């Protein structure tokens, strides 16, 4: 029997069981838990390699073979960190297993035929496309920035750079919902729209859901009163959609206790639950300990650094239409920015009390940094808090699974789309991101949308090969023409499907129906289920979770930063 060194094997086919991989320049390492390969039967494409006619490629017709195979990929997902070949058929993940030619190779369940394309993923990491659940649709160019960062699904609201959209994630009313659904039909990213949830009577909310809103957003700038909260959640329970909330910073219509009383035991997604992005001052963070509250963060406070507080004051004045010459407006801004709660937020993420991360795109958040900042928090918390049980000093698999769930499966489950997107699992849309380990979470090697490459770094178009400088991200064929419609999904509620809204608006994209929103609870948040008793000192803003004081120093240096962004 022939032998090969572990290093030579990893160089040729990627890491296998027991090998460890560093994630970019972070302090995080993953260890391969399982390898679906049969040693000696690995498939690889190229001159003199395995995937050739009669060898690793069989004779089957297209109906029996994969449309696309990613070979020897290191999959990092909430369910595991494994090495496998990934088979894609009709734009969906068909098989995770062993690729090759079943006529001559044993154990093949990912058949390769003459109709199969190949992406060489050996030495690469594959993750699910990110789900950003806090999008202000201020400009369509956000889609390019998000795709280039590894995000493939948007949940949010807006109508463009209108004053209301600059501040709130709402697409208000049937007319605007129709126009935004039609506009989204040509954007190469999955989209679900949130309507405006601020109403004390239900009819105007019901008509927005029937018009295509997959959720409703309660925002203090429209008046997040107990009456509006109760009414909105009542309609959500009736029509199985999610409610997201930005609570009352000024405590005008009530305090955190009043909001929690209005919510009752009904499921709700609390945006920027720390509070710098808005919410009851100073203690909205307490909501993260409730069983029915699904808490998320927006990325400007992630992680806590020496620059976080100063940056936030200016952002807030612009986004919420405040006037620095008005003392009350300045006081409003300053009440939201608290070092103590921002520092506690990182720790609560590491404990699994905060379940999701998101952007707050162009409205106190950066649409292209959801993935990057999530992993910066994970790195920073490893330095501050050490390994998370059951991790060891040598691998961080559990912490990695906890953090990747925050921007993939958990927002998908929260908004009732987890059956379509949010993980690398059979049956789901093939929205996949390939990373070189050295560039993990910073710059994808390529992004697949519905099984087709939608964006990738590309060199000089007049070059003799694809790699000469200048290399930058460019739209690929999956972003063009009718291919967009075959590889992207618009999400609609059942009420809109029942009235035939997709046909009425002549939507050409795939349609996904949200469901199960009202059943999701904190224990359903994958790897992020903790429900601590959170207390905030009203004078000092110190935060305690189950009696433990949550404090950490701001970071002065981070990974995934200037080393990767010289220009």
UniProtKB/Swiss-Prot annotation:
Catalyses which reaction(s): urea + 2 H2O + H(+) = hydrogencarbonate + 2 NH4(+)
A GO BP entry: urea catabolic process
Active site: 320
Single GO term (MF): nickel cation binding
Record text on cofactor binding: Binds 2 nickel ions per subunit.
Ligand binding (substrate): 219
Pathway(s) annotated for this protein in UniProt: Nitrogen metabolism; urea degradation; CO(2) and NH(3) from urea (urease route): step 1/1
Cofactor: Ni cation
PROSITE patterns xref list: UREASE_1, UREASE_2, UREASE_3
Domain Urease span(s) in chain numbering: 129-567
Main location: cytoplasm
EC identifiers of the protein: 3.5.1.5
Post-translation changes: Carboxylation allows a single lysine to coordinate two nickel ions.
Keywords assigned by UniProt, alphabetized: Cytoplasm, Hydrolase, Metal-binding, Nickel
Subcellular location: Cytoplasm
GO cellular component: cytoplasm
UniProt-listed NCBIfam families: PRK13206.1, PRK13207.1, urease_alph
PANTHER family assigned to the protein according to its UniProt record, in alphabetical order: UREASE
Family stated for the protein in its record: Belongs to the metallo-dependent hydrolases superfamily. Urease alpha subunit family.
Name of the protein described by the UniProt record: Urease subunit alpha
Organism: Pseudomonas putida (strain ATCC 47054 / DSM 6125 / CFBP 8728 / NCIMB 11950 / KT2440)
Name of the gene this protein is made from: ureC
């Amino acid at each position: 029997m022939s032998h090969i060194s572990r290093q030579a094997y990893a160089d040729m086919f990627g890491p296998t069981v027991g090998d460890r991989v560093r994630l970019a320049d972070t302090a995080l390492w993953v260890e391969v838990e399982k390898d679906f390969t049969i040693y000696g039967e690995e498939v690889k494409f190229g001159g003199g390699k395995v995937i050739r006619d009669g060898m690793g490629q069989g004779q089957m017709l297209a109906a029996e073979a994969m449309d696309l195979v990613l070979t020897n990929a290191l999959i990092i997902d909430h369910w595991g960190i494994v090495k496998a070949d990934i088979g894609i058929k009709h734009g969906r993940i068909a098989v995770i297993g062993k690729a090759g030619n079943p006529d001559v190779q044993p154990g093949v369940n990912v058949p390769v035929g003459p109709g199969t394309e190949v992406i060489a993923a050996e030495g690469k990491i594959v993750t699910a496309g990110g789900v950003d659940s806090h999008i202000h649709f201020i400009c369509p160019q956000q889609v390019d920035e998000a795709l280039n960062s590894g995000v493939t699904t948007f949940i949010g609201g807006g109508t463009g750079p209108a004053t209301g959209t600059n501040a709130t994630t709402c697409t208000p009313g049937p007319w605007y919902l129709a126009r935004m659904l039609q506009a989204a039909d040509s954007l190469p990213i999955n989209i679900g729209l949130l309507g405006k949830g601020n109403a004390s009577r239900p009819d105007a909310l019901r008509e927005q859901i029937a018009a295509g809103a997959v959720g409703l957003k309660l925002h203090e700038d429209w008046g997040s009163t107990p009456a509006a909260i109760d009414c909105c959640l009542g309609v959500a329970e009736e029509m199985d959609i999610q409610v997201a909330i930005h609570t009352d910073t000024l405590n005008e219509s009530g305090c955190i206790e009043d909001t929690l009383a209005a919510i009752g035991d009904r499921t709700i997604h609390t945006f920027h639950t720390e509070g710098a992005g808005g919410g009851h001052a100073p203690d909205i963070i307490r909501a993260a300990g409730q069983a029915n509250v699904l808490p998320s963060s927006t990325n400007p406070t992630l992680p806590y650094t020496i620059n976080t507080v100063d940056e936030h004051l200016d952002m807030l004045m612009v986004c919420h239409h405040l006037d620095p010459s008005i003392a009350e407006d300045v006081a409003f801004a300053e009440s939201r920015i608290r070092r103590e709660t921002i520092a506690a937020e990182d720790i609560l993420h590491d404990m699994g009390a905060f379940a999701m991360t998101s952007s707050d795109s162009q409205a106190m958040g950066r649409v292209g940094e959801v993935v990057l900042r999530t992993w910066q928090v994970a790195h920073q918390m490893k330095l501050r808090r050490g390994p998370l049980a059951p991790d060891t000093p040598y691998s961080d698999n559990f912490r990695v699974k906890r953090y990747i769930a925050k921007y993939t499966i958990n927002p998908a489950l929260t908004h009732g789309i987890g059956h379509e997107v949010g993980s690398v699992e059979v049956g789901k849309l093939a929205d996949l991101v390939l990373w070189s380990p050295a560039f993990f979470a910073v710059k994808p090697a390529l992004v697949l949308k519905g099984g087709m490459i939608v964006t990738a770094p590309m060199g000089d178009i007049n070059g003799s090969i694809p790699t000469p400088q200048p290399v930058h991200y460019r739209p690929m064929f999956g972003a063009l023409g009718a291919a967009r419609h075959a590889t992207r999904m618009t999400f609609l509620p059942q009420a809109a499907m029942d009235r035939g809204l997709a046909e009425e608006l002549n939507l050409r994209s795939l349609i996904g129906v949200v469901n199960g929103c009202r059943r999701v609870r904190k224990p359903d948040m994958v790897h992020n289920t903790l429900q601590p008793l959170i207390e905030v000192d009203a004078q000092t803003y110190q935060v305690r979770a189950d009696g433990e004081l949550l404090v950490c120093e701001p970071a002065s240096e981070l990974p995934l930063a200037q080393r990767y962004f010289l220009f």
